[in-house]
């Protein structure tokens, strides 16, 4: 699949086009131009490092939404084995924007749950562009309860622009479903490890992100509202999205500094979509580290650790008059 380049990556796109053209020339002639191709590839690598070394928060948001970025099922295929998907909330329907099921991580049984956006138009429509309805969150909660019953660790993967705001979703109790998940996840007596792999959009993300450990990929985002939504409210114009992204502190390093995420998982040069397999290996290592740190804790200790983590959120500065 050809790489899709974002607007700020156009210098990279031009270099990649040159490399592609040279490959065609080499294939059709006896002239050896492999040295020139190698030089351009090195130049492309250096340029990618330069561009990605100084991304703005808004550019990071664009990378987090990249259409070729790995989704939950991509990581499931690379990191887990024996995945068996489970369907339905046992109350209304099966929401395909959230996927989940039993799997094995490093040979041990676990539960995997995550948002899924879809690759093509048909799949995106079926998965509602990764925006869950109430039945999606209720399915996730059902699987978490199942994992707790059998004492299985839970891995969740967050990648959603937000919960679906449609009339039907509201009629079926969208806010109740999200709130119940927050309440229930705080009291689960098994290890819960959450990873923001793309967009972490508000309550739609948080509903499967209450964990003992919260990881975040280097170019993922996590916020209470999208930059465009914030700009539309504050400045009455979505054109101010870059300014809003800066003010919202949506990037992984900022959120790590604020204590909202525990670990930032580095991505390959150019983002996870440039080398999904390398990204999966890096994430697998981080998930293994997080699970090892929690395996010595008993059920009550896991709950206490999770609650202490939640209670530590927020900062304030006392100023004397």
Curated annotation (Swiss-Prot):
Protein family according to the UniProt entry: Belongs to the AccA family.
Native species: Bordetella pertussis (strain Tohama I / ATCC BAA-589 / NCTC 13251)
Domain CoA carboxyltransferase C-terminal: 39-293
UniProt enzyme class: transferase
Name of protein: Acetyl-coenzyme A carboxylase carboxyl transferase subunit alpha
Major subcellular location class: cytoplasm
Molecular-function GO terms, alphabetical: acetyl-CoA carboxylase activity; ATP binding; carboxyl- or carbamoyltransferase activity
Gene encoding the protein: accA
EC numbers: 2.1.3.15
Lineage: Bacteria, Pseudomonadati, Pseudomonadota, Betaproteobacteria, Burkholderiales
Record's subunit section: Acetyl-CoA carboxylase is a heterohexamer composed of biotin carboxyl carrier protein (AccB), biotin carboxylase (AccC) and two subunits each of ACCase subunit alpha (AccA) and ACCase subunit beta (AccD).
Gene3D superfamilies listed in its UniProt record: 2-enoyl-CoA Hydratase, Chain A, domain 1
Keywords for the protein's UniProt record, in alphabetical order: ATP-binding, Cytoplasm, Fatty acid biosynthesis, Fatty acid metabolism, Lipid biosynthesis, Lipid metabolism, Nucleotide-binding, Transferase
InterPro entries, alphabetized: Acetyl_CoA_COase_a_su, ClpP/crotonase-like_dom_sf, COA_CT_C
Function: Component of the acetyl coenzyme A carboxylase (ACC) complex. First, biotin carboxylase catalyzes the carboxylation of biotin on its carrier protein (BCCP) and then the CO(2) group is transferred by the carboxyltransferase to acetyl-CoA to form malonyl-CoA.
Catalysis: reaction(s): N(6)-carboxybiotinyl-L-lysyl-[protein] + acetyl-CoA = N(6)-biotinyl-L-lysyl-[protein] + malonyl-CoA
Pfam families xref list: ACCA
Biological or metabolic pathway of the protein: Lipid metabolism; malonyl-CoA biosynthesis; malonyl-CoA from acetyl-CoA: step 1/1
GO CC terms: acetyl-CoA carboxylase complex
GO biological process terms, semicolon-separated: fatty acid biosynthetic process; malonyl-CoA biosynthetic process
Subcellular location: Cytoplasm
